[in-house]
Structures are given as structure tokens and as C-alpha cells.
């Protein structure tokens, strides 16, 4: 029996694989705009440097003022938390100088995700080697640390967690999705037979979590690493996980090195076959591949989507964040033109003269016919 967590999750993981799905195909449900960089060295007012990041590992949400807000780590020092805001849906961004992150939380806690808290405000989840911690804000701008950890790696039988994205379920509970970042570069970069899974835990208050049995995403994409899950609720009400897949770390395959994938579920446990989001950007420092890392997907009030992804690695493109807008694809159906209307045929009435002995009759018709015993004259 799975026991409830007080602050830390207890180990209660049973491997019960979900049905293996086919490898991901490109998403066609949405049309994705050409990605554009929204966190840049210029915006942050710093020079491009291999040791300083403009921004990576983002979380986006609509704050209490109705602005699109993004929190990420970057700048100098590179693990400091920053926030940018946009009042026009992401077309223009500015650094929020009034943003306040708690100083009493370790800088090593990264990969933030944000969800609306049950009693108002916002709760953010961050992780490091020890587990997943949480922070709280009433407005999305000023944050305070919450005591303890929400989940630990040992609760899942893992060495290190990543992700921590949370979605609200249809029944009012919350589900958190975490990835396996144990020995990340060794396993995902060198061991070609590796496959990392995405797991989940459930909560009623976002503070105490129960580990769910099995895994949510696993071998569906073959021997690749499924990393840094974020969660969202799509316009249809389905629960979604968005995560990035490493095709082959540190190797050029002239296609894509990493990209965002997402999968949907009606209950947050059993997911559809993952779809690959085609929005990526090129990184010349790694050859010709397209890249998208640490993906975050959110639904705007107008039901359009915003995808945020990091470009890791050295410049000139690296260590910046791009955005792509997703709009529901318009389904077209072929129609057969109706046949042209035809005018009714015109009926011509004619007359003939019919005789029978001395009797004569004029008959009209189309065509006219003489009565019985009469002959046409």
C-alpha cells in the first residue's frame, strides 16, 4: 500500500510499464510560428560569454497583473533567478527589476515550474541533488521559500530528479511529473541503450505528495533520454506533459540534437503517443542540428499556446531562450460542387384539326391527338 507523505515522499514505486507506443511523429494539431529569441544577451545587458548565460530553464505563466511572466536562471552569477514580463502576449519583453527571489533557498535549485496554488497565488517547484523544493508567491513577482522538500529521488528509486511540472487534474487533485537525471551526461551522452522515464506523484494540496505506481513516459521513443518534464492543461481539458528528448548528446546527426515532445492524457496517468513539436533553432557551435531544450508549454487566455525552450551551449546562439506560438491547425475538408440548376423544359402547345364524317374538331396538346374515330385533317 502506498503511504501518504508528510513532507518527504516515501518509496512506493512499482514498475508497471504503460503500453509501448510508436516513435514520435511531428505534431500537426497546431501550427507553430517561427521561433524567436526572447531572452538574449542584449535584453539582459550582458556580453556573450561561454561562462555567463543569458537565460535557461524557464517557466512561464500569467501573473496576477495579467502579464505573461517568465522566470529563469542566468546572468551573473549564472544560477541567479531572473524574471521578464510581456504585456502583449510575448511580442515584447522587459526585465522586471522588482522581481524578488528568496535568498534563503540554495542557488543550486533550478528547473523551476509554476502552477496556480489551491488557495490563490502561485507555487513554484525547483530541484537539485537533494530533491524538489517549493516557493510561494501571491502575485508571481515576490517569492518566499517553503520549508522542507516536496519529493526526494529515493521516493522513486532514483539518484537525482529533474522537472517537477504540476498540472491540475479534472477531479481537483494535482499531479507532478519528474524525470530521471541520474548520471545525466554519462547515461544520455555515452550509453546508447539508455532510456530514461518520466514518473509522477499526486497531491491534494501541492505540499504532501504520493508517488504513483509505474511510469508515464518510457520506451515509446526508443533508446533516448526523456528529460525535464513540464505540465499543462491543453484547451480541450486534457493533461499534457512537455519534455525534451536528446537524440544524441555531443554528436552531429545533421537533423536535430534535441527537441520538444508532448503527450496528452484524460487522467494524467495514461498518455497518448508523444508528438514532436517542430519548433527548433539552429546552433552553429554544434554543427547544423536544430535544438530545443528544457521545454515549457503554456496555454494563454485566448487558447493559443506558448512554447519556451532553451538553447544550451556556447554562443553565439547558446544559453538563450526562444519562444514559438502555437495556434490550432485549421482542418480543411474537400467539398463536391452541387450540380448547376437546370431550367424546366418549355412545353409547346400546338393545335390540329380532326374530322369524322361531317364533324370537325380542333384539338390542342403537346402533342395533340385526335379522339377515337377521328382523323387528322
Predicted features along the sequence, with ranges:
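Carbohydrate-active catalytic/glycan-binding domains of CAZyme proteins
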Residues: 25-332
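A short beta-strand micro-motif
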Residues: 350-356
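Short amphipathic beta-strand/extended segments with alternating polar/hydrophobic composition
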Residues: 126, 360-366
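Short Cys/His-rich micro-motifs in 6-15 aa windows
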Residues: 374-377
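Extracellular mucin-like PTS domains
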Residues: 332-343
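Secretory targeting and sorting signals
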Residues: 1-24
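Disulfide-bonded cysteine motifs in exported proteins
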Residues: 138, 183, 349, 364-365
